Amino acid sequence: MCFSQAETLVNYSFGTCQHRKIFPHFFPSDLLGNKFLPIRGVPHRGPGCYIAEESKDLAYSLAKIPTSIKGYGFGARTAVRFKPKNKDVTPYPGMYQTVNLQEQTHKPNFAPFNTLSPRFRTYSKDPCYPGPGTYKLEKKEPQKVTWPMKFGSPDWSQVPCLQKRTLKTELSTDKDFRKHRNRLAYLSLYYN
């Protein structure tokens, strides 16, 4: 008698009499459920029969987000990581590059030496900064120090010097005098 009941139960596999959550309509709250979302909506409805406003509704987005019932499981998240892009609008030729009324200039943080400086510098028109045509090229200054000479040797009578002293030590005034004399000889190159 026990064997006859066992033979009748063999036709059914374990758990088939109960209502089971199968994948295409239900999903687990882990990594597999986040990757493969279940089918939602009415199965006999065609692709052009959906309402576009329904996809932007709060209730629709809450129903679409996979959530974890028992806290956070391994790989389960409360929201989709990458949201799907809206493909309702077909791009037209002018959509790829938008028209910017204000031209944007991007200044890089680091650049090679002297590449960020302007190409042509702007100089002021002040009379302190003369232009290229304002110089007098007719007058050429001598580049040699003029020194009083007599037959190839210096004319010491025309060179200013101090009176002779019996003491051979050099005083600070003598040193200043020689500095002043040498400066005058140098400046006579440029100013006569």
From Swiss-Prot:
Gene Ontology cellular component list: ciliary basal body; cytoplasmic vesicle; trans-Golgi network
A single GO molecular function term of this UniProt record: cytoskeletal protein binding
Organism domain of life: Eukaryota
One BP annotation, GO: cell projection organization
Pfam families: SHIPPO-rpt
Chief location of this protein within or outside the cell: cytoplasm
Subcellular location: Cytoplasmic vesicle; Golgi apparatus, trans-Golgi network; Cytoplasm
Alphabetized UniProt keyword annotations: Cilium biogenesis/degradation, Cytoplasm, Cytoplasmic vesicle, Golgi apparatus
Known function: During primary cilia disassembly, involved in cilia disassembly. Required specifically to control cilia retraction as well as the liberation and duplication of the basal body/centrosome. May act by stimulating AURKA activity at the basal body in a cell cycle-dependent manner.
The protein's assembly and partners: Interacts with proteins involved in ciliary transport, including ARL13B, CETN1, KIF3A, RAB6A, RAB8A, TUBB1 and TUBG1. Interacts with AURKA.
Name of protein: Ciliary microtubule-associated protein 3
Record organism: Bos taurus (Bovine)
